[in-house]
Amino acid sequence: MSWQTYVDDHLMCDIEGNHLSSAAILGHDGTVWAQSPSFPQLKPEEVSAIMKDFNEPGSLAPTGLHLGGTKYMVIQGEPGDVIRGKKGPGGVTIKKTNQALIIGIYGEPMTPGQCNMVVERIGDYLVEQGM
């Protein structure tokens, strides 16, 4: 299965009539493996800050999480495993696997819990596959 299939069929899937607004799978170096059409272009320093927070949990909290120039307030995640951000009624979930970052961005009417479920399910599957 191609990385684009993971994004199209598994991250952008329909959940109770809702779906993520955008999603992507990136390498730890920020290289895009696959993305939805509306996924923002990430800056190298944004990817570096995300990777730093996975290695040093809490480092993003003072500055916020930035994706494509959009700032999200960092909320409760799972140190070293999942970063979650909030902006208004929407937000983002980032799951780190051995080789990839799985990123899902959502807005209303999708809920944070639905986004977490979609992103973390794919991330957990990839970890099980050694990815």
From Swiss-Prot:
Keywords: Actin-binding, Allergen, Cytoplasm, Cytoskeleton. Its main location: cytoplasm. The keyword Cytoplasm applies. InterPro entries: PFN (IPR048278), PFN_euk (IPR005455), PFN_sf (IPR036140), Profilin_CS (IPR027310). CDD domains: PROF (cd00148). It is found in: Cytoplasm, Cytoskeleton. Gene3D superfamilies: Dynein light chain 2a, cytoplasmic. Transmembrane segments: none annotated. It comes from the Eukaryota. The keyword Cytoplasm applies. GO terms for cellular component: cell cortex; cytoskeleton. One of its GO terms (molecular function) is actin monomer binding. Occurs in many kinds of cells as a complex with monomeric actin in a 1:1 ratio. Belongs to the profilin family. PANTHER family: PROFILIN, PROFILIN-2. This is Profilin.
